[in-house]
Regions:
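Non-catalytic, solvent-exposed segments at the cell envelope interface
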Residues: 2-15, 20-297
Length: 297
């Protein structure tokens, strides 16, 4: 009887594991289908601003055309410590201090990340409290996010601006993270190791952390991670570019670590997403299946 019970337990565990694997495969395939369909649709169509994506761009007298089968995901990091879903007057919705486009090649499976400096000058649409465009000016791309009526319009305006900066590429999906999300993501993967390339302080000139000394290699935990990717001295020229370099270093290290962790535990990414969403630190139009596929493609 005892032997039979043990066999039943192992059989049950094996069935549960098989069901979990099948469910995971189903999720991955669903995510793949959704993203591939998005990539296929825009090859024949227009970008988010209605401009053709298949027209040649001339650079150094050489013509370049949009490559087929790319999935472009816009990632925005928003300053301020408030709720991403809080509605404010247009112009007060915050600024996007981190602007990145992650481009996934569905043919080669390669991933390319393009960081756009927050101070890049572009066309900025300003809207009223009803979401209607009332003015179009030239300004820093970081400002565009703040002129939406709500988070959906904020991200739509940013997608349009970034698309224009990058020769009208199509933006397929958007991921928006509040600055407070960094500590949660960082600690969920056990911390991220970085090297301090330059000394930096906040705008008051105070040292943010004793470990933030040029040349130090440190393992960031919690609040350290947020300080590393967010803070800069606004009174120092090129401090925004220095911060962009830190953000890129952090993102590369985090991507590699998160990829390894999620491959071992597929449900980790779902746990992180659930915590971020429950605290209103994440907005995205990606489905859970699409997010899981990104890590298992």
């Amino acid at each position: 009887m005892k032997h039979r019970t043990i066999i039943n337990i192992f059989t049950g565990l094996a069935l549960a594991a098989a069901v979990a694997v099948i469910a995971l495969i189903s999720i991955i395939l669903t995510g793949k289908s959704h993203l591939y369909n998005a990539a296929d649709r825009i090859v024949q169509g227009n970008n988010c601003d209605g401009d053709k994506t298949n027209e040649a761009v001339i650079f150094n007298r050489e013509p370049y055309v949009y490559k087929k089968g790319l999935i472009n995901i816009l990632i925005l990091g928003i300053d301020g410590e408030g709720n991403l879903y809080d509605n404010h007057s247009p112009g007060d919705m915050g600024q996007s201090d981190a602007v990145y486009v992650v481009s996934i090649d569905t043919q080669s499976k390669a991933t390319h990340v393009v960081g756009i400096p927050r101070d890049t000058m572009t066309t900025i649409e300003m809207s009223d409290k009803d979401g209607n465009t009332v003015a179009v000016n030239t300004g820093q791309v970081t400002l565009q996010y703040g002129y939406g009526q709500d988070i959906q319009q904020c991200t739509s305006l940013m997608a349009k601006s970034v698309s224009g900066i990058l020769y009208n590429i199509h933006i397929d999906r958007v991921v928006v993270l509040s600055v407070n999300s960094i500590a949660i993501i960082n600690d969920a993967v056990g911390g991220v190791t970085v090297t301090i390339e330059n000394d930096f302080t906040d705008e008051s000139g105070e040292v943010l952390d004793e470990a933030f000394v040029k040349g130090n290699t440190i393992h960031l935990t919690g609040e350290q991670a947020r300080l590393f990717v967010q803070e800069r001295d606004c009174n120092v020229a090129e401090s925004a570019m220095d911060r962009l370099s830190r953000q890129e270093q952090y993102m590369q290290a985090l991507e590699q670590l998160l990829y390894k962790k999620v491959r071992k535990n597929p449900f980790l990414i779902m746990k992180i997403i659930k915590e971020l969403k429950s605290n209103d630190m994440l907005y995205t139009d990606m489905t859970n299946a699409e997010i899981v596929y990104v890590f298992f493609r």
